[in-house]
Amino acid sequence: SARLCDARLSHERLSDSIDLIITSPPYINVFNYHQNYRAIMEVLGFDILKVAASEIGSNRKNRGNRFKTVVQYSLDMEETLASLVRCLKNNGILILIVGRESNVRGIPFSNSRILLEIAESNGAFDKVVTHERVFINRFGKSIWEDIIVLKAKNQFAQCRAARDIAREHLKASLSSASGDVADDITETISVLDNISPSPLLSKKGLI
């Protein structure tokens, strides 16, 4: 059977009942997923604008300063991981298939490192192993993916590390930035504590 909900609310449907979760979460600033699958979503009667507001990692958000998406993505994925660990049985396994790198205005950010740091920092998961794979896209470019295997450790771990992790990645990115790009990164760091997660999408908001 299929159950539809915001990923950050998964535990409300599947609490402590799952042995294995395999998923490929969104990446920072890559697609607007609701647009890529718009035709299907409209056939099913979903409200596209409500879905768009809650989408994780969307490049549509924060158009005035896209580096704020790095922070919002980290917060959203922290909430998602906190929900998924509560879905898993003790020692259950979570496998994340992650596009290794995203670019925001030409500045690279490691999706894999951000997610792994969030997963391990709050004590919810232990890393089991990581693998990598590569494929050639239609433009002839090599695309690397990391396969991160995590074991559920603590369903009640406190998840409060995402802001600090985002801050460190943004600070590190300044070494590759200049001009207005560097200015936007610096501005994001200065307001980082005021950036909120994406709004949760309730079941009522889907249709």
What kind of region is each of these model predictions?
Residues 1-95, 99-207:
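Class I S-adenosyl-L-methionine-dependent methyltransferase catalytic core
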